[in-house]
Each structure stands twice: as structure tokens, then as C-alpha cells.
């Protein structure tokens, strides 16, 4: 029998403090009934022999000392079934799409169990996003965690939607008639506005991407406490689809900055000693608990790949949120404000971007045999073009050699033709590599010193006029 308490002593922001006379488990679920008869859900955040701190999912407005508290003896769980695909849920896992109630095959605690390191399979095989700057230069690998670093006002939401629409596992698609049936997307939105939520849903429904997706929506006016639950709900669903149903699951979480702000708000309500810039000292551990749920398990068909998106306050990549994220994850994709102002879509700056696992999932047997060399050469050529732009600002373009001008032209074309593709263009990896070769072929063959000679002979695009002159 559940015991009921009317011992609330304090209410602070999203937290309720109550006295108890018996042990209460950490993370235990709680029901709070207000004097008006309304029931709110909560979770034990801190427990001692004399009192508990409860975080309330629906907010503390209307709760007072006369409210009753019931401890349910279980932790927060996510109802799981393959039928979740195509559904839209609140940040706490409740259906909000007008569809039927979820009839779960099982329920799991949202905290999740760590993958045994000895059972982890090393991430291999690439995921095709259809975005050249990612597929060609910073390839996403199955089981990887690759964040997108953005800034306020930049189009990271548009890029997130493009990836959600286009992402696929090419060999799975070509392996049977049900193209893409083994791929699923979990989209977890935290602290977004109603306008952004409407844009997300319109895009999912218009493009048909919702059929293979599970969407979790936590809005800006929803309680901060729910924001801390949303990514755990999303990842628990991803783990079930990946390791029980055999899907390759891509988890897109936006915006992790809002998640960390919720941690700070709750920490302040608990009067915790703050860490860097007021964020909790345990934020690194908390983020690691989320990001480390990506991966593959030996003997299981599926995989969980993560793309967390975060906006860097003040475009500062030394801010605690991107800084700690960078320590845990395996690279980063940078959204660039200057490229955005030039109208480049998506404005991905490939130079500071990095995919640490890229080399393990590209090349012969994965993408194409020339991919590693082409990527290296394009990086080098674009970097040289960028350096020369700085020089042009000092001495003018007329002072540069013919060779230098070719690299400047390459840098311009690289941004305008390779990075630029719009948010509705889906390029497969063959198109991406062919486009890279077209740009690299503007450089003399002797400049392509990072590419194997056989690949140059096969893919280098000879200038027709030059070829006729040589004949």
C-alpha cells in the first residue's frame, strides 16, 4: 500500500521539499495531489533519512503545504514498442499527436544501462546524410556521436531536418525491396518555441519522414524538469529499436544548450555549489551519461548514432557546454556565421569540423576507394585558399602567382558548389566525390600530391581545351 504524506515544507522553483519518516529511493516516481484535486508527476532528486527533494514535471504552480505526496516505489519508465515509429510524444513520453494510447511490448527505465566496454563493437560503416560537407569531408559513422556546434540565429534546425529526412544506410537500402526499412530517426527537441515545433512537424509530415521517426517535443514553456527527461526518453527508445528490433537508429537532439540551462536552473533551486559559469559541477558526468549511450553491441544487428546539436553562447567554443561536449564526443560539425551571411546553405565550415572515426568507415568496401585521398586533398586545397584570402587583403590579388590564383578560385568554388547545396538537395556519396573531383581538376595534376596516381588517372577531369591543345 502506498503511503501518503502531507509534509511539504518548501517549494523552490521546480522543486518540492517534503519530510519523510522512511527511506525513499533516488529517482523514485512521485504523485502530488493539489488541494484542487489535480495530480502532478514528479521524481525524487535527493533523498535523506528526514526529507526528499522532488522535481515536478508539470511545474509547481498550485502546489502548497496542503498538497499530498505519494511515493510509487518505481522509477520513470518509457513504454516501448516498434509501433512508436510515426508517433509524436511530449518531452516526458506522453502522446500529443491525437493518436491511440501506446500499448507497449515492454517498459524500461530511462536511465539506461551502460554498454559493457568488452561488448562494444568499434563503429564502422558510414551513414549517408546527403550533405556533401558531412559525407565527403566529415563522414558520420554508425555508432558515432558527432555533435553540431552552432550559434544563436544560425540555421541548425534546417540542417537537423535535412539530415532527419535524408539520412540512410546505403547498403541496407540496396539489400532488399523495402528500401530504408532498417533505418529509423529519433528526434528529441528541448526548449524549442511553438513556431519551431510547428516548422519541425510541418517538415516531417510534408516529406513523409515521420513514418520512420519518433519525435519528442519539449517546448520552451514546458517545465525545465521535463527537459532533463527528454533526451533520456529518446535514447531509451533508440536503444530498444536498435538492440531489440535491429534498426540502425540516428538520434538527433536539439538543443543541448537548453538541456544544460535546465540543469543549471535545477541546481540553483537546490542551492548547489556552482561550477564554471554557474553550471553544475557534475555537468560533464551528466552529458557523458547521454552521449555514451551511442554505439554498437557485439552480436546485435542495430546501432545507435547520435547527432547532438548545441548553440554556443556568444559563438564561444570554450564555453562549458561545447567544451565538455568536445571532450566526450568524436568530433564536431561547425555551423559558420560568415558562410551563413554569404548565403551558403548549409553553412558548414569544414576546416574546424572533424569526424574522428571517419577513416574507419570510408574507402574501399564502405564508400569509394578514392574517398580518403580526395577528402585530404580537398581539405589541403581549401585551407591554402583560405590562407591566401588573408594575403589578398594585404597585397591584392594582382600580386599573386597563377598557382595562388587557382587555389583562390578553388576555395570560392568549393564553398559555392560543394558546401552550397540548399536544404532540399540530397546528394549521394558518389555525387559528392564526383563533384570534389570536378573542383580538384581545376588544379594541375602535380598539385594533387595527396591522391594515388591510379585514382588521378581514373577520376581527374581533363580540361577539354587543354587536352585538344596537347593533341
Swiss-Prot record:
Xref: Pfam families: ATP-synt_ab, ATP-synt_ab_N, ATP-synt_VA_C
Main location: membrane
GO-annotated biological processes: proton motive force-driven plasma membrane ATP synthesis
InterPro entries tied to this protein: ATP-synt_VA_C (IPR055190), ATPase_a/bsu_AS (IPR020003), ATPase_A1-cplx_bsu (IPR005724), ATPase_F1/V1/A1_a/bsu_N (IPR004100), ATPase_F1/V1/A1_a/bsu_nucl-bd (IPR000194), P-loop_NTPase (IPR027417), V-ATPase_su_B/beta (IPR022879)
Membrane topology: Peripheral membrane protein
Cellular localization per UniProt: Cell membrane
Superkingdom in the source lineage: Archaea
Any single GO CC term annotated in Swiss-Prot or TrEMBL for this entry: plasma membrane
GO molecular function: ATP binding; proton-transporting ATP synthase activity, rotational mechanism
UniProt keywords, alphabetically: ATP synthesis, Cell membrane, Hydrogen ion transport, Ion transport, Membrane, Transport
Family: Belongs to the ATPase alpha/beta chains family.
Its job: Component of the A-type ATP synthase that produces ATP from ADP in the presence of a proton gradient across the membrane. The B chain is a regulatory subunit.
Listed PANTHER family: V-TYPE PROTON ATPASE SUBUNIT B (PTHR43389:SF4)
Description of how the protein assembles with itself and partners: Has multiple subunits with at least A(3), B(3), C, D, E, F, H, I and proteolipid K(x).
HAMAP family from the UniProt entry: ATP_synth_B_arch (MF_00310)
Protein name: A-type ATP synthase subunit B
Organism: Natronomonas pharaonis (strain ATCC 35678 / DSM 2160 / CIP 103997 / JCM 8858 / NBRC 14720 / NCIMB 2260 / Gabara) (Halobacterium pharaonis)
Classification lineage: Archaea, Methanobacteriati, Methanobacteriota, Stenosarchaea group, Halobacteria
Amino acid at each position: 500500500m502506498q503511503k501518503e504524506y502531507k509534509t511539504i515544507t518548501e517549494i523552490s522553483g521546480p522543486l518540492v521539499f517534503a519530510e519523510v519518516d522512511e527511506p525513499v529511493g533516488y529517482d523514485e516516481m512521485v504523485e502530488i495531489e493539489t488541494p484542487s484535486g489535480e495530480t502532478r508527476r514528479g521524481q525524487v532528486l535527493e533523498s535523506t533519512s528526514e526529507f526528499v527533494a522532488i522535481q515536478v514535471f508539470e511545474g509547481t504552480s498550485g502546489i502548497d503545504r496542503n498538497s499530498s505526496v505519494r511515493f510509487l516505489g518505481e522509477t520513470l519508465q518509457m513504454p516501448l514498442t516498434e509501433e512508436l515509429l510515426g508517433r509524436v510524444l511530449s518531452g516526458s513520453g506522453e502522446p500529443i499527436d491525437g493518436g491511440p494510447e501506446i500499448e507497449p511490448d515492454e517498459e524500461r527505465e530511462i536511465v539506461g544501462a551502460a554498454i559493457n566496454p568488452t561488448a562494444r563493437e568499434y563503429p564502422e560503416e558510414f551513414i549517408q546524410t546527403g550533405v556533401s560537407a558531412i559525407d565527403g569531408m566529415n563522414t558520420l559513422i554508425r555508432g558515432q556521436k558527432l555533435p553540431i556546434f552552432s550559434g544563436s540565429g544560425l540555421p541548425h534546425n534546417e540542417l537537423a531536418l535535412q539530415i532527419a529526412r535524408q539520412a540512410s544506410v546505403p547498403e541496407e537500402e540496396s539489400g532488399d525491396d523495402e528500401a530504408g526499412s532498417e533505418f529509423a530517426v529519433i528526434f528529441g527537441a528541448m526548449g524549442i518555441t511553438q513556431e519551431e515545433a510547428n516548422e519541425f512537424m510541418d517538415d516531417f509530415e510534408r516529406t513523409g519522414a515521420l513514418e520512420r521517426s519518433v519525435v519528442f517535443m519539449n517546448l520552451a514553456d514546458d517545465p525545465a524538469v521535463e527537459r532533463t527527461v527528454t533526451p533520456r526518453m529518446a535514447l531509451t527508445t533508440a536503444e530498444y529499436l536498435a538492440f531489440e528490433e535491429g534498426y540502425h537508429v540516428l538520434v538527433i537532439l536539439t538543443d543541448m544548450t537548453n538541456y544544460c540551462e535546465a540543469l543549471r536552473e535545477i541546481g540553483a533551486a537546490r542551492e548547489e555549489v556552482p561550477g564554471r559559469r554557474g553550471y553544475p559541477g557534475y555537468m560533464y558526468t551528466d552529458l557523458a551519461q547521454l552521449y555514451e549511450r551511442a554505439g554498437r553491441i557485439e552480436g546485435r544487428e542495430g546501432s545507435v548514432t547520435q547527432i547532438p546539436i548545441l548553440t554556443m553562447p556568444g559563438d564561444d567554443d570554450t564555453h562549458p557546454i561545447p567544451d565538455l561536449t568536445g571532450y566526450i564526443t568524436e568530433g564536431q560539425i561547425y555551423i559558420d556565421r560568415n558562410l551563413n551571411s554569404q548565403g551558403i546553405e548549409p553553412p558548414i565550415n569544414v576546416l574546424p569540423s572533424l569526424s574522428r572515426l571517419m577513416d574507419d568507415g570510408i574507402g574501399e568496401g564502405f564508400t569509394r576507394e578514392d574517398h580518403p585521398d580526395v577528402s585530404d586533398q580537398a581539405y589541403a586545397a581549401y585551407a591554402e585558399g583560405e590562407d591566401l584570402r588573408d594575403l589578398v587583403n594585404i597585397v591584392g590579388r594582382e600580386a599573386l602567382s597563377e598557382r595562388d590564383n587557382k587555389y583562390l578560385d578553388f576555395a570560392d568554388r568549393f564553398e559555392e558548389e560543394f558546401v552550397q547545396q540548399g536544404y532540399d538537395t540530397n546528394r549521394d556519396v558518389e555525387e559528392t566525390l564526383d563533384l570534389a573531383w570536378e573542383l580538384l581538376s581545376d588544379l594541375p595534376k602535380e598539385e594533387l600530391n595527396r591522391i594515388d596516381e591510379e585514382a588521378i588517372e581514373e577520376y581527374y577531369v581533363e580540361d577539354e581545351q587543354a587536352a585538344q591543345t596537347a593533341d
